[in-house]
Amino acid sequence: MTAGHVDPTRIIERYYDQQPGREWERLERHRTEFAVTLGALGTYLPPPPARVLDCGGGPGRYAIELACRGYEVTLFDLSAANLRLAREKADEADVTLTAYEQGTATDLSRFADGAFDATLLMGPLYHLLEKGDRQQALAEARRVLKPGGPLFAAFISRYAVPRWAAANEPAWPLEHPEELEKILATGVLAPSGEEGSGFVAYFAHPAEVVPLCQRAGFEVAAVLGAEGLVSMLEAGVNALSGAAWDAWVDLNCRVAADPSILGCVEHLLAVAVKPRWRTVLAQIARQLNEAGVAYRVGGGAAIALHGVPIPVKDLDLVTDVAGAYHFQALFADHVVEPVALREDKVWRSHLGRFDFDGVTVEIIGDLHRRKGGEWVLATTVTETTVNLDGAPIRVPWLEEEALFYVWRGRLDRAAQCLHYCDRDRLLALWRQKQATGVCGQEEIPSF
């Protein structure tokens, strides 16, 4: 809630109910945005007849286009009038949408976990003024998305309003200085009047898009400037047809992912993926916890679970010898390389490799490192628990992982961690190294 007891959700519902054709006509006028977005959908969507949720899809401009291409599309929108218009437009196009559902993007409880192969969230994030609501909408989009499925999340850019004013109402900054300052400082265009009216919006800064999606558990593949190079300059281009129009579509699709243009467009499109590894790890953890197998998650997954935005290529689970063979017994159908004692010049462990829906999992029992002529147990000295989809996951402190990467010479990975580390914890572990020469997983260099 903002502006007293005014509910922005009801305001925006009225806004679209009053003119349900508004969004359909907007995309007719702004052909470049539509073309670039369709290009992204064509690149990242799984092939038809994949199940697609168009959440906040308005009168169904994208939903109907995807249905024409063979996708099974559920259209979900806040506005009943938008949904009625979508039915009419679908009939005109002679296509059938799977369902028409009315509701808010922060509550998709009518849909089961993993119900869709892809999710479009191209509208709701324009109007959710509170950060918690934007996070909730992304969390719900992730929940109903199948592991490995893409999300397409659209935002209005922080600078869309002043750019619009420059093109259409140059006196606007002088006439509305307080509104301009609030948008620049907070991104919020709040309800006006006691009952609220007009366009309620949140204008996202380009720099916040990726972290917001990552905190919701997505891995971001791209952020696109939907208008490409023609933001506020598109009238002439949009009047083109044939080869000339196709050439501009190709150019704008090619440059859309260039970070240098993201502050100079009206709409940003984040393309993200619900990583399979999170779902796989949660499933494994529940079974290991139930079986009483002690383990810790290490490597990139441990860092990502602490909130560091890095891609995870595989899962490393560290346990003892008995735990490694117990893991193999529990997941015998997933064995790629059976657990066995393996060693090289530096490391020795009871190592096995497994495959879960394309995610490689390594189980490491009693990891040792050669020190001099002896094998020394390499173990962590810290532990904390993080929650992953309701499953408690044991991981080392992020600070210990950061120091481990320093020791290994992976300064790039260590630097990614340091911004998220607790300074006092980091210093405490470093002082422990100074006193003992050992910090958790093994020695780290003195410098």
Regions of interest found by a model, annotated:
Residues 283-315, 319-321, 325-328, 397:
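Active-site nucleotide-donor binding segment shared across nucleotidyl transfer reactions
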Residues 109-119:
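A short acidic, Gly/Pro-enriched loop at the edge of an enzyme's catalytic core
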